C-alpha cells in the first residue's frame, strides 16, 4: 500500500457509486468511516446535478468496532427502502469494511427479507481494483442480475427490434464530457437511421435492462466503462460489440464503417460512405482546418499527452495523424490495460509512459519542454508552474471541465471542439513578447522555480534583469539551459555573466 495525496483514478468504491447513482431510482449505501463519504459533495458540485445524490453512508465508528456492523447496516438498508422506495439498493464495500472482514453478503441476504426493492452487494475487491475497474465490474453485475431475474420469470423479450438499434454503454455521472458525448452519439445514430434502444447507466431504469438483448449491436465509446457488460451481452445473446472510439475524423469514419458492416450482416442494406464524405468535408471543420495555414504553423511543434486510455490514445492519433504535431511522449494511468495503449499509440509518438505517479509525469514534461501539454487537471497545474499551456482532455478534472455549453468530444461536432482545444492550447507567435512590450495585466515576473520543489541554484539581481530582457516565448528554455549549464560547471549563483557563458556554450 502507498500513501498518496493525488490519485488519477480514485478508490474502488467511487467507481461503484458513479455507476449506481447514474441509474434512476437506485440508492447506494456505503459501509465506510466518515472521510470516505466525499462522493456526495463531488457529484453535486462537479456534475452540477440538480437531484440529491442517492448515497447514504453507514458510518463505521467505535460502536461498530465494538459490536459489529450487521445491525446497523441492515437497519440502514431497510430504512432507506421504506423512505425512498428505490428499485435497487447497492451496498458498497470499502477498504475499511475489507480490513474488518465484515460478512456483507450475509447482511444483504438479511436485509432482502424485509426490503421491498432489490438489494445487491457490489462484488469488488478494494485492494485489487481502482475506480475505473470497479465501475466496469459493478455495471456488468447489475446488468447480469436483472437479465437473470427476467430470465427466471420468463420476461426476457424475444428477438431483435424491427429497425437497426443500438445500446450505448458507458455514459455515467462524473464522466469527462459524458452528457455532451451522449447527445452527439444520439444525433449521429439518428443521422445513420439507427434507433437508440438504451443508454446505460446514465438516466436508465433497472427495469429496462431486460430489453438490452433486443439491440442489433452495442457501442462502447469509452474503454474504461462498459466492455465487461458488452462482452457479457455478446456471449449470452450474440450481440456484436463495437469499441472503436469515434473521436477525430479518421476514427469516427472507421466507427461508422464498422456499424455499417455489423448491421448489414444482420439483414440491413445501408451505405454510409456518402454521409462520411459530406460530414468530413462540410460539417466537421477539422479536415479543412488541418490544411489551413493556421494548422501548418503547428506542424512539427512538440506536444505531450497524458490521460485515461480512451482519451490519451485518441488525442495522440489526432495530433500526429490529422494535425502533423510531433507527440514526444504519450502516457496513461490505466496500468491494468497498458498493452492495449502501447499497441494503439506506439507508432504515433516517440515514447510511451505508463504510470500513476504524477511526479514522474511532471518531471517528464519538464525534461522535454513541449510547446503544449494535453492531460488531466494535474498536468494543467504542472503546465502553470512551467509556463507551458495545457489543454485538459481527460479525467480527473475540476468544475471548469464540466462545461455548461455544448462541448462533445465524440462524433463530428466533437472533432471541431477538439481542433479548437488543440489550436488554442498553443501559444500564438509573439503573443507573450508583445504583451510584455506594451504592458498590461499579463506582464509577470520570471518564475525561477522548476518542477522540483528544491532548487540548488539562485539567480542574482543582474542575472534576473538580463533574463527578463529575453522574449517570453523562449525565456523558459533559456532559463532551463542556463541552470543546466550552471549545475554542470558547479556555479551556485547565476549572474548575467553565467547567462552569457551559457548562451555561448549552446551556440545561442
UniProtKB/Swiss-Prot annotation:
Could you mention a single GO BP entry for this protein?
Answer: photosynthesis, dark reaction
Keyword Cytoplasm belongs to the record: no
Q: Which cofactor does it need?
A: [4Fe-4S] cluster
Which InterPro entries does the record cross-reference, listed alphabetically?
ChlB/BchB/BchZ, LI-POR_suB-like_C, Nase/OxRdtase_comp1, P-CP_red_C, Protochl_reductB, Protochlorophyllide_Rdtase
Name the catalysed reactions. chlorophyllide a + oxidized 2[4Fe-4S]-[ferredoxin] + 2 ADP + 2 phosphate = protochlorophyllide a + reduced 2[4Fe-4S]-[ferredoxin] + 2 ATP + 2 H2O
* Note describing how the cofactor binds: Binds 1 [4Fe-4S] cluster per heterodimer. The cluster is bound at the heterodimer interface by residues from both subunits.
Positions binding substrate in this chain are: 429-430
Residues in the active site? 294 (proton donor)
**Its function?**
Component of the dark-operative protochlorophyllide reductase (DPOR) that uses Mg-ATP and reduced ferredoxin to reduce ring D of protochlorophyllide (Pchlide) to form chlorophyllide a (Chlide). This reaction is light-independent. The NB-protein (ChlN-ChlB) is the catalytic component of the complex.
Q: What is this protein called?
A: Light-independent protochlorophyllide reductase subunit B
Q: What organism is listed for this UniProt entry?
A: Trichormus variabilis (strain ATCC 29413 / PCC 7937) (Anabaena variabilis)
Amino acid at each position: 500500500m502507498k500513501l498518496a495525496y493525488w490519485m488519477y483514478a480514485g478508490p474502488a468504491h467511487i467507481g461503484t457509486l458513479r455507476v449506481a447513482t447514474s441509474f434512476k431510482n437506485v440508492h447506494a449505501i456505503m459501509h465506510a468511516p466518515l472521510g470516505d463519504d466525499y462522493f456526495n459533495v463531488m457529484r453535486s458540485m462537479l456534475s452540477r446535478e440538480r437531484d440529491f445524490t442517492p448515497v447514504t453512508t453507514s458510518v463505521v465508528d467505535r460502536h461498530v468496532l465494538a459490536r459489529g456492523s450487521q445491525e446497523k447496516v441492515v437497519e440502514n438498508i431497510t430504512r432507506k427502502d421504506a423512505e425512498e422506495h428505490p428499485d435497487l439498493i447497492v451496498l458498497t464495500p470499502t477498504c475499511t469494511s475489507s480490513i474488518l472482514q465484515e460478512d456483507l453478503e450475509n447482511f444483504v441476504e438479511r436485509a432482502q427479507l424485509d426490503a421491498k426493492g432489490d438489494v445487491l452487494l457490489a462484488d469488488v475487491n478494494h485492494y485489487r481494483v481502482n475506480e475505473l475497474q470497479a465501475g466496469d465490474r459493478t455495471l456488468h453485475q447489475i446488468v447480469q442480475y436483472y437479465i437473470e431475474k427476467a430470465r427466471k420469470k420468463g420476461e426476457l423479450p424475444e428477438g431483435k427490434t424491427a429497425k437497426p438499434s443500438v445500446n450505448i454503454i458507458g455514459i455515467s455521472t462524473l464522466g469527462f464530457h459524458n452528457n455532451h458525448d451522449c447527445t452527439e452519439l444520439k444525433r449521429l445514430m439518428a443521422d445513420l437511421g439507427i434507433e437508440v434502444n438504451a443508454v446505460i447507466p446514465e438516466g436508465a431504469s433497472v427495469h429496462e435492462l431486460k430489453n438490452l438483448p433486443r439491440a442489433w449491436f452495442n457501442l462502447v465509446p469509452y474503454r474504461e466503462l462498459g466492455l465487461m457488460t458488452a462482452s457479457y451481452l455478446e456471449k449470452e445473446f450474440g450481440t456484436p460489440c463495437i469499441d472503436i472510439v469515434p473521436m477525430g475524423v479518421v476514427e469516427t469514419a472507421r466507427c461508422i464503417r464498422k456499424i455499417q458492416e455489423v448491421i448489414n450482416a444482420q439483414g440491413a442494406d445501408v451505405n454510409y460512405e456518402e454521409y462520411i464524405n459530406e460530414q468530413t468535408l462540410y460539417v466537421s471543420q477539422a479536415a479543412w482546418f488541418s490544411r489551413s495555414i493556421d494548422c501548418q504553423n503547428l506542424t512539427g511543434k512538440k506536444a505531450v499527452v497524458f490521460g485515461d486510455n480512451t482519451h490519451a490514445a485518441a488525442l495522440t492519433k489526432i495530433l500526429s495523424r490529422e494535425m502533423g504535431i510531433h507527440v514526444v511522449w504519450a502516457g496513461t494511468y490505466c496500468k491494468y490495460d497498458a498493452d492495449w495503449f502501447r499497441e494503439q499509440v506506439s507508432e504515433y509518438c516517440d515514447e510511451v509512459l505508463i504510470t500513476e505517479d504524477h511526479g514522474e509525469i511532471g518531471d517528464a514534461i519538464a525534461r522535454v519542454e513541449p510547446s503544449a501539454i494535453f492531460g488531466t487537471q494535474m498536468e494543467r497545474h504542472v503546465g502553470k508552474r512551467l509556463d507551458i499551456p495545457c489543454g485538459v482532455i481527460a479525467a480527473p478534472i475540476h468544475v471548469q471541465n464540466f462545461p455548461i455549453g455544448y462541448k462533445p468530444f465524440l462524433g463530428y461536432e466533437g472533432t471541431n471542439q477538439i481542433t479548437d482545444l488543440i489550436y488554442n492550447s498553443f501559444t500564438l507567435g509573439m503573443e507573450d513578447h508583445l504583451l510584455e512590450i506594451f504592458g498590461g495585466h499579463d506582464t509577470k515576473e520570471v518564475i525561477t522555480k522548476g518542477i522540483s520543489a528544491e532548487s540548488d541554484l539562485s539567480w542574482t539581481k543582474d542575472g534576473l534583469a538580463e533574463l527578463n530582457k529575453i522574449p517570453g516565448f523562449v525565456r523558459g528554455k533559456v532559463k532551463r539551459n542556463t541552470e543546466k549549464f550552471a549545475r554542470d560547471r558547479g556555479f551556485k549563483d547565476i549572474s548575467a555573466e553565467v547567462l552569457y557563458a551559457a548562451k555561448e556554450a549552446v551556440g545561442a
